[in-house]
């Protein structure tokens, strides 16, 4: 069925403001004039002259809801994924926002997503595009760095800004006065990623690290500089976690001697460390072949899942050899193989499959389903989903995972979920011929 121009314009907007830009690119390649179809399209694609022409003809249009989403024009520009997905159009989109602001656009323009999620223009700039220039532009125009409103879910701006490797956008938002409790909360999100520069920025720009943040960092095997930054910013050093373990005990259990040294230098209580902690650490570091007797098996299972999430192949092997269960704790919803596949960790997938891991899971899911879902949604193998585009997920790692699973006899699901993409379509997108 051939779409008319308004339908194609709506399809362009839908794709340009989503994580999947492929249809937007195809539509623009087929009909470059579609970028100037209306004010919404011109904003989303960075057509500066067209935006200026329309504003000159009708100045009040700068703040009127328009286009297929009924948004103010500035929102189409700020939420356009072309800002980070098309280097040719990005300068134009920034200039569009500048001209809209000069013409009186509201830097706090917003819409409500899915009934109760507040989405402000700054979220598009800092949390979706990760664009320092646009973030600074909106803040200088008066955008509120705290996206919170009674009755709606907020905290999208900083929560997602801290997912990017460059800490600049998150820093700009914090320094502009983001509410302190949100800064503290989002430090936890930042710790999901292996980026010490981001954590150091949080810690030197007002974040108040908790004991939980310190435990999170050590359990996730973050580097010594991250642990030092958290402690130096006030994280309680000897508080126990939910398992009754201090940060030093956790570091010793991982065999992380450099992290343990940082903790000891800053006064961690050495008397809390037990022979069991040292025995587990000796096994995981390869100094001893076995863990001490009496270890609760679920503790090994949990450490193995964390090792898989972090991509630690040697630790995973040693934990399996020490008694961690190949399919994980039966009481847990987490599958070790599912974690490896979702995160695109091919070597770990191969290790688990060769050791006999089940290809289907207790919850009805499957290893191949986890891999296919990750190929569309897992932007970072440690941090998981973020606001980046599908294009930014390295497809080669998922293609290798699929080859391993298919060779082991895994079957491709018809669809991902009740109304998701077809499994064979996703397999083909990874450059693999779907099995007969």
Stretch-by-stretch model annotation:
Residues 2-15, 34-38, 176-181, 204-209, ...:
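Ankyrin-repeat-protein effector appendages
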Residues 14-19, 41-47, 76-93, 120-131, ...:
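Ankyrin repeat A-helix N-terminal signature
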Residues 25-32, 53-61, 97-106, 136-145, ...:
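Ankyrin repeat domain, specifically the short helix-to-loop turn at the C-terminus of the second helix
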Residues 37, 62-66, 107-110, 145-149, ...:
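Ankyrin repeat boundary signal
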């Amino acid at each position: 069925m051939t779409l008319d121009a308004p339908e194609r314009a709506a399809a362009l907007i839908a794709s340009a403001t989503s994580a999947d830009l492929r249809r937007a690119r195809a539509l623009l390649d087929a009909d470059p004039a579609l970028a100037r179809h209306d004010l919404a399209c011109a904003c989303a694609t960075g057509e500066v002259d067209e935006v200026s022409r329309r504003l000159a003809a009708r100045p009040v249009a700068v703040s009127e809801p328009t286009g297929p989403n009924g948004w103010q024009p500035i929102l189409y520009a700020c939420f356009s994924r072309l800002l980070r997905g098309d280097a040719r159009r990005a300068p134009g989109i920034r200039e569009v926002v500048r001209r809209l602001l000069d013409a009186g656009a509201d830097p706090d323009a917003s819409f409500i997503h899915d009934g109760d999620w507040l989405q402000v223009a700054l979220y598009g700039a800092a949390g979706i595009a990760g664009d320092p220039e646009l973030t600074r532009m909106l803040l200088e125009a008066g955008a509120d760095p705290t996206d919170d409103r009674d009755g709606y879910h907020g905290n999208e701006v900083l929560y997602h800004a801290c997912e990017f490797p460059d800490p600049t956008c998150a820093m700009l938002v914090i320094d502009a006065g983001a509410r302190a409790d949100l800064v503290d909360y989002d430090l936890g999100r930042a710790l999901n990623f292996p980026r010490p520069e981001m954590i150091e920025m949080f810690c030197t720009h007002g974040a108040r690290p908790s004991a939980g943040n310190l435990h999170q960092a050590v359990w996730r095997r973050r580097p010594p500089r991250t642990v030092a930054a958290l402690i130096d910013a006030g994280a309680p050093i000897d508080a126990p976690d939910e398992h009754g373990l201090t940060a030093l005990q956790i570091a010793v259990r991982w065999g992380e001697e450099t992290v343990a040294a940082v903790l000891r230098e800053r006064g961690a209580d050495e008397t809390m460390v037990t022979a069991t902690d040292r025995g587990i650490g000796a096994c995981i570091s390869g100094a001893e072949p076995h863990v001490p007797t009496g270890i609760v098996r679920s503790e090994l299972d949990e450490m193995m899942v964390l090792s898989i999430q972090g991509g630690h192949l040697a630790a995973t092997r040693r934990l399996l050899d020490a008694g961690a269960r190949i399919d994980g704790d039966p009481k847990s919803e987490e599958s070790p193989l599912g974690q490896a596949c979702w995160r695109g960790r091919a070597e770990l997938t191969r290790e688990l499959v060769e050791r006999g891991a089940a290809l289907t899971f207790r919850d009805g899911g499957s290893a191949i389903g986890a891999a296919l879902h990750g190929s569309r949604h897992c932007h970072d193998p440690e941090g998981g989903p973020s606001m980046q585009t599908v294009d930014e997920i390295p497809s080669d790692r998922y293609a290798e995972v699929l080859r391993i699973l298919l060779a082991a006899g895994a079957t491709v699901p018809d669809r991902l979920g009740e109304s998701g993409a077809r499994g064979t379509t996703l397999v083909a997108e990874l450059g693999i011929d779907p099995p007969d």
